[in-house]
A protein has these predicted regions:
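Helix-turn-helix
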Residues: 10, 18-52, 56-57
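Amphipathic alpha-helical linker/stalk segments
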Residues: 2, 57-85, 119-123, 128, ...
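Amphipathic alpha-helical segments used for helix-helix packing
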Residues: 95-117, 167-175
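Short amphipathic alpha-helical elements of helix-turn-helix/winged-helix folds
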Residues: 14-18, 159
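Hydrophobic alpha-helical connector segments
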Residues: 71-102, 149-153, 186, 202
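N-terminal intrinsically disordered/low-complexity leader segments
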Residues: 1-6, 13
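C-terminal peripheral helix-coil segments that are non-catalytic and often amphipathic
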Residues: 92, 96, 125-141, 145, ...
Protein backbone atom coordinates (compact mmCIF):
# COMPACT_ATOMS: atom_id res chain seq x y z
CA UNK A 1 0.00 0.00 0.00
CA UNK A 2 2.80 2.40 0.95
CA UNK A 3 4.62 1.45 -2.25
CA UNK A 4 1.49 2.22 -4.33
CA UNK A 5 1.12 5.59 -2.62
CA UNK A 6 4.77 6.36 -3.31
CA UNK A 7 4.39 5.40 -6.98
CA UNK A 8 1.29 7.59 -7.33
CA UNK A 9 3.16 10.53 -5.83
CA UNK A 10 6.07 9.94 -8.22
CA UNK A 11 3.67 9.97 -11.15
CA UNK A 12 1.93 13.17 -10.03
CA UNK A 13 5.27 14.91 -9.50
CA UNK A 14 6.48 13.76 -12.92
CA UNK A 15 3.23 14.85 -14.58
CA UNK A 16 3.51 18.25 -12.92
CA UNK A 17 6.99 18.78 -14.37
CA UNK A 18 6.00 17.65 -17.86
CA UNK A 19 2.76 19.66 -17.96
CA UNK A 20 4.52 22.83 -16.79
CA UNK A 21 7.22 22.32 -19.42
CA UNK A 22 5.04 21.26 -22.36
CA UNK A 23 1.39 21.89 -21.52
CA UNK A 24 -1.37 19.32 -21.92
CA UNK A 25 -1.21 19.16 -25.71
CA UNK A 26 2.58 18.81 -25.81
CA UNK A 27 2.84 16.21 -23.04
CA UNK A 28 2.91 12.48 -23.80
CA UNK A 29 2.22 9.63 -21.40
CA UNK A 30 5.61 8.18 -22.34
CA UNK A 31 7.28 11.43 -21.24
CA UNK A 32 5.53 11.23 -17.87
CA UNK A 33 6.45 7.56 -17.45
CA UNK A 34 10.11 8.30 -18.25
CA UNK A 35 10.17 11.21 -15.80
CA UNK A 36 8.62 9.03 -13.08
CA UNK A 37 11.08 6.22 -13.76
CA UNK A 38 8.40 3.65 -14.56
CA UNK A 39 7.18 1.94 -17.73
CA UNK A 40 4.17 3.12 -19.69
CA UNK A 41 2.10 0.05 -18.77
CA UNK A 42 2.48 0.83 -15.08
CA UNK A 43 1.54 4.46 -15.70
CA UNK A 44 -1.68 3.34 -17.43
CA UNK A 45 -2.39 1.01 -14.50
CA UNK A 46 -2.59 4.03 -12.20
CA UNK A 47 -3.93 6.64 -14.62
CA UNK A 48 -5.73 5.81 -17.84
CA UNK A 49 -5.26 9.15 -19.60
CA UNK A 50 -3.16 12.29 -19.47
CA UNK A 51 -6.40 14.32 -19.21
CA UNK A 52 -7.11 12.67 -15.87
CA UNK A 53 -3.56 13.37 -14.72
CA UNK A 54 -3.82 16.97 -15.86
CA UNK A 55 -7.07 17.39 -13.92
CA UNK A 56 -5.40 16.11 -10.75
CA UNK A 57 -2.33 18.34 -11.15
CA UNK A 58 -4.44 21.40 -11.99
CA UNK A 59 -6.91 20.93 -9.12
CA UNK A 60 -4.13 20.21 -6.62
CA UNK A 61 -2.28 23.42 -7.48
CA UNK A 62 -5.37 25.56 -7.93
CA UNK A 63 -6.93 24.46 -4.64
CA UNK A 64 -3.88 25.66 -2.72
CA UNK A 65 -4.04 29.17 -4.14
CA UNK A 66 -7.48 30.13 -5.42
CA UNK A 67 -10.06 27.94 -3.68
CA UNK A 68 -9.48 29.45 -0.18
CA UNK A 69 -10.08 32.95 -1.60
CA UNK A 70 -13.82 32.27 -1.42
CA UNK A 71 -13.69 32.08 2.38
CA UNK A 72 -11.59 35.23 2.60
CA UNK A 73 -13.94 37.27 0.41
CA UNK A 74 -17.15 36.18 2.13
CA UNK A 75 -18.57 37.95 5.17
CA UNK A 76 -19.04 41.57 6.20
CA UNK A 77 -15.49 42.64 6.99
CA UNK A 78 -14.26 45.91 5.44
CA UNK A 79 -13.00 45.63 1.87
CA UNK A 80 -9.55 46.83 2.94
CA UNK A 81 -9.14 43.90 5.34
CA UNK A 82 -10.25 41.43 2.70
CA UNK A 83 -7.77 42.83 0.18
CA UNK A 84 -4.87 42.60 2.64
CA UNK A 85 -5.71 38.99 3.43
CA UNK A 86 -6.24 38.08 -0.24
CA UNK A 87 -2.82 39.46 -1.19
CA UNK A 88 -1.10 37.77 1.74
CA UNK A 89 -2.74 34.44 0.98
CA UNK A 90 -2.23 34.72 -2.78
CA UNK A 91 1.50 35.40 -2.54
CA UNK A 92 1.96 32.73 0.14
CA UNK A 93 0.03 30.23 -1.96
CA UNK A 94 1.97 30.90 -5.15
CA UNK A 95 5.22 30.59 -3.18
CA UNK A 96 4.17 27.00 -2.45
CA UNK A 97 3.26 26.25 -6.09
CA UNK A 98 5.38 28.77 -8.05
CA UNK A 99 4.78 26.97 -11.34
CA UNK A 100 1.01 27.72 -11.22
CA UNK A 101 0.97 31.14 -12.99
CA UNK A 102 3.00 29.91 -15.99
CA UNK A 103 1.04 26.65 -15.98
CA UNK A 104 -2.30 28.50 -16.23
CA UNK A 105 -1.08 31.12 -18.72
CA UNK A 106 0.29 28.41 -20.98
CA UNK A 107 -2.99 26.51 -20.98
CA UNK A 108 -5.07 29.68 -21.42
CA UNK A 109 -3.07 30.48 -24.56
CA UNK A 110 -3.33 26.94 -25.94
CA UNK A 111 -6.90 26.05 -24.94
CA UNK A 112 -8.68 29.18 -23.69
CA UNK A 113 -12.25 27.82 -23.75
CA UNK A 114 -11.43 24.74 -21.69
CA UNK A 115 -9.31 26.63 -19.16
CA UNK A 116 -11.93 29.37 -18.70
CA UNK A 117 -14.56 26.68 -18.15
CA UNK A 118 -12.33 25.10 -15.50
CA UNK A 119 -11.79 28.44 -13.76
CA UNK A 120 -15.51 29.26 -13.80
CA UNK A 121 -16.27 25.88 -12.23
CA UNK A 122 -14.08 26.57 -9.20
CA UNK A 123 -16.04 26.91 -5.90
CA UNK A 124 -14.51 30.32 -5.18
CA UNK A 125 -15.68 31.86 -8.48
CA UNK A 126 -19.07 32.95 -7.07
CA UNK A 127 -17.42 34.62 -4.07
CA UNK A 128 -15.06 36.53 -6.37
CA UNK A 129 -18.01 37.79 -8.45
CA UNK A 130 -19.87 38.85 -5.28
CA UNK A 131 -16.79 40.71 -4.07
CA UNK A 132 -16.64 42.63 -7.34
CA UNK A 133 -20.25 43.75 -6.76
CA UNK A 134 -19.26 44.74 -3.23
CA UNK A 135 -16.47 46.91 -4.65
CA UNK A 136 -18.96 48.72 -6.90
CA UNK A 137 -21.33 49.36 -3.97
CA UNK A 138 -18.53 50.57 -1.70
CA UNK A 139 -17.45 53.01 -4.40
CA UNK A 140 -20.98 54.37 -4.80
CA UNK A 141 -21.30 54.80 -1.02
CA UNK A 142 -18.00 56.67 -0.76
CA UNK A 143 -16.29 54.02 1.37
CA UNK A 144 -13.61 53.62 -1.28
CA UNK A 145 -12.74 55.37 -4.51
CA UNK A 146 -15.02 54.42 -7.40
CA UNK A 147 -12.97 52.03 -9.50
CA UNK A 148 -13.63 49.28 -11.99
CA UNK A 149 -13.67 45.98 -10.08
CA UNK A 150 -12.01 44.40 -13.12
CA UNK A 151 -9.13 46.89 -12.84
CA UNK A 152 -8.89 46.08 -9.13
CA UNK A 153 -8.75 42.37 -9.93
CA UNK A 154 -6.08 42.90 -12.60
CA UNK A 155 -3.99 45.10 -10.31
CA UNK A 156 -4.04 42.58 -7.46
CA UNK A 157 -3.26 39.61 -9.71
CA UNK A 158 -0.46 41.36 -11.61
CA UNK A 159 1.21 42.73 -8.46
CA UNK A 160 1.16 39.25 -6.92
CA UNK A 161 1.98 37.09 -9.93
CA UNK A 162 4.53 39.02 -12.00
CA UNK A 163 7.53 38.47 -9.67
CA UNK A 164 7.03 34.70 -9.91
CA UNK A 165 6.67 34.72 -13.70
CA UNK A 166 9.74 36.96 -14.03
CA UNK A 167 11.78 35.22 -11.32
CA UNK A 168 14.73 34.14 -13.54
CA UNK A 169 14.93 37.68 -14.94
CA UNK A 170 14.69 39.37 -11.53
CA UNK A 171 17.30 37.09 -9.96
CA UNK A 172 19.60 37.42 -12.95
CA UNK A 173 19.47 41.21 -13.31
CA UNK A 174 19.65 41.99 -9.60
CA UNK A 175 21.97 39.05 -8.77
CA UNK A 176 19.72 37.60 -6.10
CA UNK A 177 20.00 34.12 -4.70
CA UNK A 178 16.91 32.14 -3.64
CA UNK A 179 17.00 33.41 -0.06
CA UNK A 180 17.10 37.03 -1.21
CA UNK A 181 14.29 36.44 -3.69
CA UNK A 182 12.13 34.80 -1.01
CA UNK A 183 12.71 37.83 1.23
CA UNK A 184 11.71 40.12 -1.64
CA UNK A 185 8.48 38.15 -2.08
CA UNK A 186 7.72 38.32 1.65
CA UNK A 187 8.19 42.11 1.61
CA UNK A 188 5.95 42.32 -1.43
CA UNK A 189 2.89 41.26 0.58
CA UNK A 190 2.80 44.58 2.44
CA UNK A 191 4.00 46.62 -0.53
CA UNK A 192 1.29 45.28 -2.85
CA UNK A 193 -1.41 45.85 -0.23
CA UNK A 194 -0.18 49.40 0.39
CA UNK A 195 -0.27 50.20 -3.34
CA UNK A 196 -3.81 48.86 -3.78
CA UNK A 197 -5.20 50.49 -0.63
CA UNK A 198 -3.63 53.87 -1.46
CA UNK A 199 -5.28 53.69 -4.89
CA UNK A 200 -8.67 52.89 -3.32
CA UNK A 201 -8.67 55.79 -0.86
CA UNK A 202 -11.73 58.00 -1.53
Amino acid sequence: MAQEKNTEEQIIEAARKIFVKRGLDGARMQDIADEAGINKAMLHYYYRSKDKLFEIVFNEAFSKVVTPLGHILEGTRPIEEKIKEVIDHYITGISQVPYLPIFILSEVNQRPEIMIKRLNAQPSFGSIMNFMKEVIEAGKNGKIREVSPIQLFLNIVSLCIFPFVARPLVQGIFQQDNVQFDLLIEERKKMAADVILAWLKP
